[in-house]
Every structure is written in C-alpha cells, then in structure tokens.
Amino acid sequence: MTTSTSKNAISKSSQEDLCSDTKDKGSSGGGNEANAEASKAIQGFRLVLLFVGLALSVFCLSLVCISEFISTFLFTRTYPDVFGFGRIVQSWLRPFRELRPSLIPLTTWRGSAPLTCYPRVVFSFLLESCTRSSRYGACSLRRWVFSSWDHSSAHLAPSLLLPGLCPCIVAQSVFTDRATWRWCFWINLPLGGVTAVAVFLFVRLPSPQGGATTFLGLLQKLDALGTCILMPLIICLLLALQWGGTTYAWNSWRVVLCLVLFTVLLVAWLYVQYRQGDGGALPLRIVRQRSIRSAILFTFGINGSMFIIVYYVPIWFQAVKDVTAQQSGINFLACSGSMSVAAIIAGTLVSTGEEKQHQGQWRIFNYTTLVSIATGLIWRYNPATSTAYCRAGTLVMFGFGAGSGMQMPFIAAQTVLSASDISLGSSLIILIQTMGGAVFLAVSQNLFQSKLIGLLESHPYGVEPEFILDTGASGLRSAVQHKYGTKAVETVLQAYNTALRQCFLVCIVLACLTIIADAGMEWKNVRAGKKPAKAPDAHHESKTDIK
C-alpha cells in the first residue's frame, strides 16, 4: 500500500515537472521569437529613407493617375485623335490592372521585397519612352500596359493614393501649363530610383507560412488561367460600352459580338474560380462573407462615382468655365484636399472610438449621405455657376464624403476575415475599384458623346460635332469663336454643359445605391483583435505521453 502510494506521488511529481519544463520552453520560445521579430524591425535612418521612398512611390503613382484626368484634353494640342483611339485605350487598358489579384502570391515568396523594385525600374524607363512617341495611341498603349504592372505590384503595399492626390494635382497642372505634359512622366525617373533603392536595400520581408519557397512554386500559385480569361472579358465589356450608340449602333454585329463574348467569358471565369477553389484569384469563401459582399457593392459604387467626378469636373472647368489646366487643378484641390483630410479623420475615429460604437459603419453611412447630396448639387452646374459655389458648396462636400468612406471596405476586410485572408480580401476590393472606374467611365463617356452629338446636330449655326470632339476641352471657347463666330459660343457651351450633366446623373444613381451596401454591412467591433491559432496544449500532451 505504501509502495503504490509512493509510486503515485513520484508519477505525479514527474508529470508536474514535465509540464513546467514544457511551459518554460514554450514561454522562452515565444520570447525568443518576439525578440527576433523586434530585432528585424527597421529603425533610425533606414526607416526614414524607406518611408521617404514609399511616399515618393505614392506620389509617382498619383501623378500618373491624375495626368489621365487633367492633362487628357491638353494632349489634343499634340494628338488630335484624343477622343478616338486614345480615349478608348485609356479606359480599355485600365482593366489590365486586374493582374493585381493574381500577383498576391508574390507576397508569399521569400524574395518578394526586391521583386517590387523591378517593375518600378522598368515602368520608369518605359514611361520615358512614352514621351518620345509620335502617336497618342502608342503613348497610351505603353503607358497603360506597363503602369498596369507597376500598379499591380506597388498597390500590394501602399494601396491608397489619397495622400498623394493634393500635391500631384498642382504639380501635374504646372507641368502641363508651364513646361510640357511630358514632365509628368520624366519625373518618375529620379523619384522612382529613390524608391527602388530604398526598398531593395532596407526591406527584408519574412516568408509567410505556406508561401512559395522557389520561383517554380511561385509560378504554380499564380492564377494564370483566370487572369487570361479576365482580361478579354472586361475588354469586351468596355468595347461594347464604348462603341454602342456612338461609333456603332447597339444592334451592330460588333457590339453584339462583344456582349456575347463578355457573357461567355464571364461564365468561363466563374467556373474556373469555382473549380480552383482557394487557389483561384477569387476564393468563394471570401465572397460568401456578408460584409465582403457589401464592401464589393459599396466599392463598385464609390469608385464609379469618384472616377466620373475626378474625370469630368476638370473637363467642365476647362470647357465651360474656360480656365487653364493649372487653374482647373487648383479648383479641384477643394475636393482632393477635403478627401485626404476626411480619410485621416475617419481612420482616426475608427481606430480610437469606443468598442461598441462601430465607427466604420457610420463612416460608410456618412459617405452615402454626403456624396448623394454633393453629386446632386454638382448635377446643377451651368455656365453661370460661380467658382466659389463649385469649390466650397459641392467639391468640399463630395471630397469629405468620399474620404470618409473610401477606406472602410478595407477596414471591413481586415475585421471580418482571418489574418491569412486579409491580403486576398483587400486585393478583391482593389480589383472592384478599378473595374468600377473603368466600367462607369465608359458608360459616362458613351452618355456624354451621345448627348453632345445629338444636341450639336440640331445646332442652328451648323456646328460640326466632329470638330467639337476633336478640339477637346482646353481652348474650346476660342476655337468655336474663331470658326463659327461669337453667337455660336454660348449655345455650344450650353450643349457641352448639358452633356456633362448626363455623367453627373450617373454619379447620383451610384451614390444612392450604396445605401444597399450600408444595410448589408455587419456591425462588428473593428478594434477586436484576431483570434490566434490554437496552439497544442502542452499540459495535455505531457499527460498523454506519460500514460
């Protein structure tokens, strides 16, 4: 009896010693891992240089994006076919940025940090070649093809370009008016070089678990088939929207063929994503999440309306108000400046608000309210509208509303998805951003040209629609006055204003439809941390081993 009792006591003490040893090892291991992660953190001068490099990268990307909005109609001085092939290419090649979801596996490769430098270097030098092109089509083709690769890789880290919009609008306008629009591309050479050096020297990203360790394994993870289907799918859609009712009739065989190909390719792409499961660019488990579906709908609406405003309001300033590109950019600072300020305020409120206030939901509702009112006021623009009303009354309100809601889909993805799915969810939202902008820019362009051509064909002074379209927005008043006389100017400007209001009407519809996404968004605590993966119970394992 005594012997069995002593054996039990010895066994119990040995179990306790083993459990304590296991816990000590686990705690020491966790401490070592924490110390290792802390030692790898970038500090001091390296951190400052890396921050400057990434900031310059955002500046360069914003400059290229803004150049398509403000400088487009000054390019007509060099390229008279801007409303033809050049305009199609600008909307047509935008979906090539849909490479972004397929490039998500690049972040799981152990060499992902230096890999982001190569697109920047190639992109900078090819942008320089754009300035040497003698045809606008070649310039646009090179610019958008290679900017698609650069945006696809660079947006994996700095996904929001809002901080770069304010200085870029003024810088781009000054380049265009005072020097040449080619400086919008030349400036990428020195600034892009600083970014490439900073990232290449100082960024050392750890390889995530489950990531590809070899280049061959990385290629196998890329969704090449889905990407090859997605590109022509959206090209067919945009061509149909671009041609229908303007270049060709809606019942033309070209437009019908594009719509048929779009439908077939869409079914094929969805089938490929279903068959690939989690290995595809669009994992179904992410789309099934309620907040992600709402974020997709919200992003589609917000970016569709924002791209139309950013594109067509500068056109309205240059054509209807007869201002220079520089002054147009300064006027639009009311929108971009308030957008940046609102984004910072909204992000701060979400991160510092009380746990039960669910600030992210209210920021999205603020967007719907403010942008719906602002787009309604913008729709009322006419040749007699004062510049002060445009700046303070409408653009500030629109920018504040857009800035307060633009980041919320990303915050929703970070809140409702697991840590391993955040990159996929964010990439999906960025894909919807570019798709929304591309699709609704094509829709608004179709409405604009159709309305403008219809109004000019019934013009009493015999104004040719082709002449107005080829002239562009910059210098429209002087061109019409020189060819058709002073009496035709006001009528042409009124027709131009009426056609632009069709685009602003699309913004009103998109802004109001985001209320559906507001209702579908879950009320989640955005400050709640992610639940870590459950580690094996050392105490339980030790007992099992002893038994």
Curated annotation (Swiss-Prot):
Annotated family: Belongs to the major facilitator superfamily. TCR/Tet family.
Q: Where is this region: Disordered?
A: 1-33
Q: What organism is listed for this UniProt entry?
A: Talaromyces variabilis
Q: What is this protein called?
A: Varicidin biosynthesis cluster MFS-type transporer
Domain of life where this protein originates? Eukaryota
What residue ranges carry the coiled-coil annotation? none
> Which gene holds the coding sequence for this protein?
mfs
Q: How does it sit in the membrane?
A: Multi-pass membrane protein
Give a short account of what the protein does: MFS-type transporer; part of the gene cluster that mediates the biosynthesis of varicidin A, an antifungal natural product containing a cis-octahydrodecalin core.
